[in-house]
């Protein structure tokens, strides 16, 4: 068995945390949407709260916010796919079950691998095998997710979310301009771009920003969205991508659909069928295989 390097010991756990944290999206988002809150408003407050928390953390650490002009341009571009991914996922929640929507986003490892091939970085055979196995596992889980009809619009939004999420991962991993920027500062600026985009979108659409967001429960959900699927998942994704590479980091995101299915079952009454259990088992085995036989 190959001995794991220091990068692997840091990157693999970070990748697992990324998947679990991001898979908690529906736990906080669905109650807000069910209360009538607009997608743009939810995402604006989610990102704005996250920016405030991260900004305070950076101030306490006395870390400089300074970036050069080229880095600012890259960070702006980096924030756009992450922003789009959240938008598409939340739109998908309107059409299909939340667990199914979040599970479909896990198509992004295949997209990452394809993008990396175009960048002349061909994954090793264990990684390809893991991608194939996890894709099969997700397909099985999707086929057993409750009794709701599958609306193609929701599927389309989920796939779009997966694609732009893949772009986000590759940008973090491949761009040398931001290599010197700390993970926390990178996350801060990516989320700052998102909060600005959602604020402009909300103002232009003329929506009531506070509609469906009144009451302590709503704000606790927004804080939950800001901390776990936003700050934690984004920061650990950056750590994983930098330590083990974009493709392996994306495969470890298998814990995202697993978490989403569990949340859907326990919180929203979505069925936990034998197909889902088999899919989870296949996915976990494939990730374990990748970790055991590969290292960086």
Where are these regions (language model features)?
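Hydrophobic transmembrane alpha-helices of multi-pass small-molecule transport proteins
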Residues: 54, 107, 123-144, 162, ...
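Juxtamembrane helix-entry segments on the extracytoplasmic side of multipass membrane proteins
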Residues: 7-12, 36-44, 67-72, 143-164, ...
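C-terminal transmembrane-helix exit sites in multi-pass transporters
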Residues: 53, 58-59, 108-132, 258-277
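C-terminal-most transmembrane helix of multi-pass membrane proteins
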Residues: 2-4, 43, 47, 143, ...
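Transmembrane alpha-helical segments that form core, pore/gating elements
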Residues: 30, 54, 112-113, 118, ...
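Specific transmembrane alpha-helical segments of multi-pass solute transporters/efflux pumps
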Residues: 21, 57-101, 105, 140, ...
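Glycine-/small-residue-enriched transmembrane alpha-helix faces in small-molecule transporters
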Residues: 1-41, 45, 80, 84, ...
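Helix-helix packing/entry segments at the starts of transmembrane helices
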Residues: 19, 45, 100-107, 172-195, ...
């Amino acid at each position: 068995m190959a001995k794991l390097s220091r990068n692997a010991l840091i990157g693999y756990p970070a990748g697992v945390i990324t998947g679990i944290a991001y898979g908690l999206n529906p736990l906080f988002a669905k109650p807000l949407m069910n209360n009538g809150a607009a997608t743009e408003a939810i995402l604006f407050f989610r990102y704005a709260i996250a920016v405030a928390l991260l900004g305070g953390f950076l101030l306490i650490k006395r870390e400089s916010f300074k970036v050069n002009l080229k880095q600012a341009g890259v960070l702006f571009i980096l924030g756009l796919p992450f922003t789009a991914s959240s938008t598409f996922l939340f739109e998908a929640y309107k059409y299909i079950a939340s667990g199914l929507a979040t599970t479909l986003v896990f198509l992004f490892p295949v997209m990452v691998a394809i993008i990396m091939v175009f960048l002349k970085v061909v994954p090793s055979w264990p990684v390809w095998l893991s991608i194939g196995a996890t894709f099969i596992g997700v397909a099985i889980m999707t086929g057993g997710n409750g009794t709701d009809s599958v609306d193609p619009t929701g599927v389309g939004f989920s796939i779009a979310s997966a694609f732009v999420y893949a772009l986000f991962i590759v940008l973090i991993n491949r761009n040398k301009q931001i290599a010197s920027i700390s993970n926390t500062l990178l996350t801060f600026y990516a989320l700052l771009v998102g909060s600005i985009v959602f604020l402009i979108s909300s103002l232009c659409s003329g929506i009531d920003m506070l509609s469906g967001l009144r009451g302590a429960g709503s704000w606790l959900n927004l804080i939950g969205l800001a901390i776990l699927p936003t700050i934690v998942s984004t920061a650990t994704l950056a750590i994983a991508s930098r330590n083990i590479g974009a493709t392996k980091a994306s495969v470890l995101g298998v814990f995202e659909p697993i978490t989403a299915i569990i949340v859907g079952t326990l919180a929203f009454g979505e069925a936990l069928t034998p197909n889902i259990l088999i899919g989870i088992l296949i996915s976990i085995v494939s990730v374990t295989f990748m970790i055991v036989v590969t290292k960086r």
